[in-house]
Design a protein with these regions (language model features):
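Nuclease catalytic cores that cleave nucleic-acid phosphodiester bonds
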Residues: 2-99
Length: 99
């Protein structure tokens, strides 16, 4: 079973490349995930729902299914919210540099 990595898109993008397009971020994450042998989901803000709330809900869902879950963010509040359900938290800047 490979890990599922949930990426806080705006947090990661702002960490290193504030002008990077959404598409380029997704492409970089997809290439990284393929190299690392993990599954990745880049999470953006949605209609009426923050990316943070979407990440928290998805993390809880995946954890309940017994999946290995990582979250990439430097957002302190988000890190605290997902900590009980994740196997690894990667800082946004650190994650961006891995891409």
């Amino acid at each position: 079973m490979s890990a599922i990595v949930l990426v806080d898109a705006e947090n990661v993008r702002r960490s290193v490349w504030p002008n990077l397009s959404r598409e380029e971020l997704v492409e970089r994450v997809e290439r990284w995930a393929e190299r690392e042998g993990v599954h990745a989901q880049v999470v953006f803000e949605g209609r009426g729902e923050t990316a943070d709330d979407r990440i928290v809900a998805k993390t809880a869902e995946l954890h309940a299914q017994g999946e290995e879950v990582w979250v990439a963010t430097s957002d302190r509040e988000l890190r605290e919210r997902v900590e009980p359900c994740v196997d690894r938290i990667i800082g946004g800047g650190s994650f961006a540099r891995m891409l």
